[in-house]
Regions:
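N-terminal capping/small domains of soluble enzymes
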Residues: 1-106, 370, 375-378, 382, ...
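A mid-to-C-terminal "edge-of-domain" accessory segment
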Residues: 1-38, 292-474, 510-513
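Alpha/beta enzyme core
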Residues: 6, 32, 46-67, 83-89, ...
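Short, small-residue-enriched loops and turns at beta-alpha junctions
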Residues: 39, 43-44, 73-77, 131-133, ...
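Short beta-alpha connecting loops at secondary-structure transitions
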Residues: 134, 208-210, 238, 266-274, ...
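Catalytic alpha/beta core domains of metabolic enzymes, predominantly
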Residues: 215-348
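Positively charged, aromatic-enriched nucleic acid-contacting surfaces
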Residues: 459-463, 506-529
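Mixed-charge, glycine-accented linear interaction segment located at domain edges/termini
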Residues: 526-529, 533-552
Length: 552
């Protein structure tokens, strides 16, 4: 790799612009403009059909976008037809403004206005490239020539809007802003604003595209702050950003840019777009949400959004994509699962006003996800907290702590052997197969009790070993389970101590099943566990004891 062929291609403002760094958070949502139907669509291997675009447009409206870029109508007949379809079929709500893109070239601008006939609310977005590299290599024009292109385009927009009797809003982008000298970008933008003369009731949009991301985010923020402080008509200008993600910092560019004075963000759902994509509006919006700031977009049914996006575009969402990927809430690590399980119990008990569960930046249910399928996931790395949480929340089994540990070792061993994640139903079946009502090699066929003096109990226990003949033994104890345990020890010369016993109902009704958990300790100190399920809690406890013995 020849690193010497590369150098910085960005330009810092002529004066320090770091006021944005004094702020630690975004306080309100910007104006959002979706460019999914333009930047997103043109980046697809197979662009969307007219029908898919219409459905995508409806989805964006449903999410809450009030400004939607619908295409470059002069660029192709398909994009022209799409805009005409939206207008002629009256698909644009009164509170939604469509945005159309045009180069600062006369015939393209005129074609764009032709496509807009009959549109009630529109933003006409004109652009030309201003960067040093494009001036030198692509257009071979001077700064004065490039400025003239922008001004002439701005004049034509104003002229055609007046001729049409419309009140379209105007937007200008110095394309490749990040590779443009800030002083020159400011000069061009102010010249355009001088043409448009924006007012409080008809503001102009100045859009600063990170067409190609060239710097660290703080550099972009400083460039944005410089523009915000020095633009003419600033109170009547909506300062917009259009970040791309070439260096993987699109979200940071947007967030720091808002701190630096930006009022508006252009981006896409899930970060779709050319090369590495546009800024992901979902991530920026949800980052605000998790700090208590309303993004003013509805992401409450994220699975629906994901499905629709993949259906329309043919793209797949990365499993690790923030907030929307299939694994973003998943915890496989044992310590993480334990912390989440304890955090969830704390939330249930304390009912606090704010969400603070470890490892979960937001409540997954806020965006249509669920704990069972999305949060606690079991594989060979998982621990007792995760296994216990699944068995308790999904199946109502409140295992003793040490039994949860034993069950987690069993689950991890199976997962490791099969090289796969275990689903909740597979974990439940594994628990039943391993710890519930195991009747081999020892099995009890019948038990009868007799009350003795001083609270003692006599048990008549009929049992067999490995399918052999049944034998009946009598033994005493200080309780029913203790008496049965003594009978089994006597019959089979077993050595263990009964060290743990808990029970609870599995349902809230008079005929509910009960479950008992029994732990025994062998002479070598190893614990063995069993569970018994039966409507009769005495029978359930006996089955649990037998299972623990069989699991030695």
């Amino acid at each position: 790799m020849n690193v010497k062929k590369y150098q910085k291609q960005y330009y810092m403002p002529p004066v320090p612009c770091m006021d944005w760094a004094k702020k630690d958070s975004i306080e309100k949502a910007p104006v959002w403009c979706s460019v999914d139907l333009r930047d997103g669509n043109q980046a697809l291997v197979i662009p969307m059909s007219l029908e898919q675009k219409v459905e995508f447009f409806k989805l964006l409206v449903e999410v809450g976008f009030k400004e939607i870029e619908v295409g470059f109508p002069a660029a192709s007949e398909t994009e022209y037809e799409f805009l005409r379809t939206l207008i002629e079929q009256d698909l644009i709500p009164d509170d939604v403004t469509v945005q159309v893109l045009t180069q600062a070239r006369e015939h393209i601008i005129r074609k764009t206005f032709e496509a807009l006939k009959g549109c009630k609310n529109a933003i006409v977005h004109v652009y030309n490239s201003t960067s040093y590299a494009q001036r030198q290599q692509v257009f071979k024009k001077s700064k004065e020539d490039i400025l003239k292109i922008a001004v002439e385009g701005a004049k034509l927009l104003k002229e055609l809007t007046e001729e049409a009797g419309e009140k379209y809003r105007f937007e200008y982008s110095p394309e490749s802003f990040t590779g443009t000298e800030p002083e020159y970008a400011l000069e061009v933008c102010n010249a355009v604003l001088d043409v448009w003369q924006p007012t409080a009731d008809r503001k102009a949009i100045i859009n600063l595209p990170s067409t190609v991301e060239l710097s660290m985010p703080h550099v972009y923020a400083s460039q944005v702050e410089y523009m915000s402080k020095n633009l003419k008509y600033r109170n009547n200008v909506v300062l917009s950003l259009h970040p791309h993600n070439d260096r993987g910092c699109g979200v940071s560019d947007a967030e720091m840019g808002i701190l630096a004075g930006a009022d508006r963000i252009e981006g896409t759902l899930f970060g779709n777009g050319e090369r590495t994509g546009n800024v992901d509006i979902i991530t920026v919006g949800m980052n605000m949400y998790m700090q208590g700031v309303d993004p003013e977009l509805d992401f409450s049914d994220m699975p629906k959004l994901c499905h629709a996006f993949e259906s329309f575009t043919g793209m797949s969402i990365n499993p690790r994509s923030p907030y929307c990927g299939s694994l973003v809430f998943a915890a496989f690590s044992g310590s993480h699962q334990d912390a989440i399980a304890k955090g969830m119990h704390w939330i249930e008990e304390k009912a606090p006003d704010t969400w603070t569960v470890p490892y979960l930046p937001i409540d997954p249910t806020d965006i249509g996800r669920n704990y069972d399928a999305d949060v606690i996931r079991i594989n060979s790395q998982s621990g007792k907290g995760g296994v216990g949480y699944i068995l308790e929340t999904k199946y109502g089994l409140n295992l003793p702590a040490k039994m949860r540990e034993a069950m987690s070792y069993t689950a991890k061993s199976v997962s490791d052997h099969l090289h796969k994640e275990l689903r909740p139903d597979e974990i439940f079946e594994l628990f039943k197969d391993t710890f519930e009502n195991v009747t081999t090699p020892y099995n009890i066929n019948g038990v009868h009790f007799k009350q003795l003096d001083e609270g003692r109990i006599e048990a008549q226990v009929t049992s067999n070993y490995e399918g052999g003949e049944y034998a009946t033994v009598y033994a005493e104890g200080n309780g029913r389970l203790n008496a049965v345990s003594n009978a089994l020890k006597q019959q089979y010369n077993l050595q263990y101590d009964l060290v743990s016993y808990t029970e609870h109902a599995l349902e809230q009704s008079s005929s509910a099943q009960a479950i008992a958990y029994v732990g025994i300790k062998k002479p070598d100190g190893i614990l063995s566990w069993g569970a018994g399920v039966d409507p009769d809690i005495i029978r359930a406890s006996i089955d649990a004891l037998v299972t623990a013995i069989n699991n030695r």
